[in-house]
Design a protein with these regions (language model features):
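Structural signature of cysteine-dependent C-C bond-forming condensing enzymes
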Residues: 23-33, 59-64, 86-96, 100, ...
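Conserved active-site "lid/cap" helical segment
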Residues: 1-33
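Conserved catalytic cysteine-centered active-site region
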Residues: 5-12, 40-93
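Short beta-strand segments
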Residues: 38, 69, 94-100, 126
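Short glycine-rich or small-residue beta-strand-to-loop segments that form or flank ligand, phosphate
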Residues: 34-40
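Condensing-enzyme catalytic core mediating Claisen C-C bond formation in acyl metabolism
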Residues: 1-8, 110-139
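Flexible, glycine-rich active-site loops centered on histidine and acidic residues
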Residues: 89-120
């Protein structure tokens, strides 16, 4: 498993993943409408890590940000939240960032759970596309 340096936070890992993803997609940062950050190891209690990432990524101050503190189900939960936000028609592009530096809190002496965890950050891009009526089917 991977262990981040003690000076590295979850936002550092997600920042690197997000910058690469935005570059690969050739997205303008101003076009990103929401950023949701999922972690059990946020950088701070306050301010929200999503707001820190919004600033570090250079996103618009109009970009909606939200932290979600969940473990295994966090990514799926955040996907549901972004999907709901986008289906309202007010948001087109979003970033789902998930990261943890959990090994700072884990003991390598705990042989039952320590091997299950690692430090990582991920970035997922989502873009809303309306379906034409002719492409929709009812069941």
């Amino acid at each position: 498993h991977r262990r981040a340096d003690n000076s590295v936070c979850a936002s550092d890992l997600c920042l690197a993943a997000a910058e690469r993803l935005i570059s690969d997609l050739k997205w303008e940062k101003e076009s990103i409408d929401c950023l949701i950050f999922v972690s059990q190891t946020p950088d701070y209690i306050l301010p929200a890590t999503s707001a820190i990432l919004q600033d570090r990524l250079g996103l618009s101050t109009h970009c909606y940000t939200l932290d979600i503190s969940l473990g295994c189900s966090g990514w799926v939960y955040a996907l549901s939240v972004i999907s709901s936000l986008m289906s309202s028609g007010h948001m087109k592009r979003g970033l789902l960032l998930a990261g943890d530096t959990i090994l700072k809190m884990a003991s390598d002496k705990d042989k039952s759970s320590y091997p299950l965890f690692g430090d990582a950050g991920s970035a997922t891009a989502l873009e809303y596309t309306a379906l034409e009526k002719s492409n929709m089917r009812r069941r």
